[in-house]
Design a protein with these regions (language model features):
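Short acidic (Asp/Glu) and glycine-rich catalytic loops that position anionic groups and cofactors
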Residues: 42-47, 216-224, 247-249
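A short, conserved structural fragment
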Residues: 273-283
Length: 292
């Protein structure tokens, strides 16, 4: 993708980064890990209040990464590209497959404001009361939610991780779930319990925060580039189509046919690539997907 001219202001200039000193803290004790994780969460909180961050897209991209991580927990071979295909190319009535189900759950968990209804839509098998608020500090609540879910279903890492991130977001007062524990915790990590799991969750938040902050900065720059080319787009409904691109991890041209013809949708997507405002994400000649 083409970069903005060096004379242009950097849209991500005032977005926070994870400082090197914070990355380097040992986090060997719960107190040290809590300090580091708290600082990282404060930076993530700042990102969510900055207008230049395409938040829906940011959450969607993180959700895709979390889905790939969760698929690894289950021993599945699918990575981000395969899960993206399952989500974007699925037709009404199609079964997304096991990895696609994981991707769909994470996508549904992040795309709407956090609520009991959002969690039930993401995890239809949730029992009444699962996901309820718990006592303690935010990461303590998240750790307890994970431990409780695994006590009910030890192999269901997806439910445990979604509920853990939901508990964390609620405790922090965030409007939407952000898949930090889904990104930062490994299958081995989930074998711990009690204080050990709490320590691991603090470390996982710090581990996930750095890449999440960098992704926010990258997407802010790419979103600014996309917005800058809108006057060059000739298709009717271009502004609405651009808003859809800014809200999704990826789109197929067919997703735009409610706004324009199939041919116009393909031209629109190819024009974005030509202008350096989007990428074709698959490398294929057919069934192409586009995004930032």
């Amino acid at each position: 993708m083409s970069r903005a001219r060096s004379s242009d202001p950097d849209p991500a200039a005032d977005l926070p980064r994870l400082p090197d000193w914070l990355r380097g803290l040992p986090g060997e004790t719960l107190e040290d890990a809590a300090l580091s994780a708290g600082a990282a969460l404060a930076l993530l909180h700042q990102v969510q209040s900055r207008a230049q961050t395409p938040l829906a897209l940011w959450r969607a991209r993180l959700a895709l990464q979390a889905a790939a991580q969760t698929a690894r927990h289950a021993g599945r071979p699918e990575r981000e590209a395969a899960i993206r295909d399952a989500l974007c190319l699925m037709r009404p009535g199609d079964a997304p497959g096991p990895a696609g189900e994981i991707g769909l759950a994470w996508q549904r968990a992040v795309e709407r404001p956090l609520s009991d209804e959002t969690l039930a839509r993401a995890l239809p098998h949730l029992a009444a009361g699962q996901g309820a608020a718990l006592p303690g500090a935010p990461i303590q609540q998240a750790s307890a939610a994970i431990e409780a879910a695994l006590a009910e279903a030890p192999r269901d890492h997806l439910t445990a991780l979604v509920l853990g991130d939901a508990a964390l977001a609620r405790a922090l007062g965030w409007s939407h779930l952000l898949p930090l524990l889904g990104l930062g915790l490994t299958r081995r990590d989930l074998g711990a319990g009690g204080v050990d799991l709490r320590l691991t969750c603090h470390r996982a938040v710090l581990k996930a925060a750095g890449p999440a902050l960098q992704l926010a900065a990258d997407l802010a720059r790419q979103a600014a580039r996309l917005q800058s080319v809108v006057p060059k787009l000739r298709a009717k409904q271009s502004t609405r189509a651009v808003q859809l691109v800014l809200a999704r991890d990826a789109i197929a041209p067919a997703m735009l046919t409610g706004l324009m013809s199939d041919r116009a949708a393909r031209r629109f997507c190819d024009r974005l690539v030509e202008l350096g405002a989007a990428r074709e994400l698959t490398g294929r000649e057919t069934f192409r997907l586009y995004g930032l």
